[in-house]
């Protein structure tokens, strides 16, 4: 009998136009470039004879499985996603796609984030998922609003300095 696990949380099916284009480009690259290369290498490894002790053959089979798994995921995910390419009617409040500048009330440090879909998060660029605790706390806030965010590192208080939708 297998161990019961709660169902995985569904991620928000929103994405920016840039994120959608990136996922489509990745799917296209996997399907048209990487997969054919791996299939050719797999055929060459299979032609070398005994497959039971053929490390190249085993590696290529595994690699092909990983590519096929990612292709299936991307195909399903792209169908489910909704591209958000317009700014909200209330451009002074924080919604999906917003570029937000925050001030940490405790340290005075200025932080800049963009709220994006879960498929396009990038900590290095300051892109946070709309499903993250900080983004959920930020939604519908306006400039000069002070709010508390319950983050993994503890409770933090922030002030919204600016909201911009120029990137949409």
UniProtKB/Swiss-Prot annotation:
Pfam families: GreA_GreB, GreA_GreB_N. InterPro entries: GreA/GreB_C_sf, TF_GreA/GreB_CS, Tscrpt_elong_fac_GreA/B, Tscrpt_elong_fac_GreA/B_C, Tscrpt_elong_fac_GreA/B_fam, Tscrpt_elong_fac_GreA/B_N, Tscrpt_elong_fac_GreA/B_N_sf, Tscrpt_elong_fac_GreB. One of its GO terms (molecular function) is RNA polymerase binding. Keywords: DNA-binding, Transcription, Transcription regulation. Necessary for efficient RNA polymerase transcription elongation past template-encoded arresting sites. The arresting sites in DNA have the property of trapping a certain fraction of elongating RNA polymerases that pass through, resulting in locked ternary complexes. Cleavage of the nascent transcript by cleavage factors such as GreA or GreB allows the resumption of elongation from the new 3'terminus. GreB releases sequences of up to 9 nucleotides in length. Belongs to the GreA/GreB family. GreB subfamily. Gene3D superfamilies: Transcription elongation factor, GreA/GreB, C-terminal domain, Transcription elongation factor, GreA/GreB, N-terminal domain. GO terms for biological process: DNA-templated transcription elongation; regulation of DNA-templated transcription elongation. It comes from Xanthomonas axonopodis pv. citri (strain 306). The keyword DNA-binding applies. This is Transcription elongation factor GreB.
């Amino acid at each position: 009998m297998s161990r019961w696990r709660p169902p995985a949380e569904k991620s928000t099916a929103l994405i920016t136009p840039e994120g959608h284009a990136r996922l489509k480009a990745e799917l296209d690259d996997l399907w048209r470039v990487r997969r054919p290369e791996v299939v050719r290498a797999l055929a060459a490894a299979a032609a070398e004879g005994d497959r039971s002790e053929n490390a190249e053959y085993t590696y290529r089979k595994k690699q092909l499985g990983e590519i096929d798994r990612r292709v299936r995921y991307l195909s399903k995910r792209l169908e489910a996603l909704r591209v958000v390419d317009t700014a909200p009617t209330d451009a002074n409040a924080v919604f999906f796609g917003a570029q937000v500048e925050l001030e940490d009330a405790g340290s005075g440090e200025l932080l800049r984030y963009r709220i994006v879909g879960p498929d396009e998060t990038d900590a290095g660029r300051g892109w946070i998922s709309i499903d993250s605790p900080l983004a959920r706390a930020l939604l519908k806030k306006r400039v000069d609003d002070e709010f508390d965010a319950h983050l993994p590192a503890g409770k933090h208080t922030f002030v919204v300095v600016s909201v911009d939708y120029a990137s949409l």
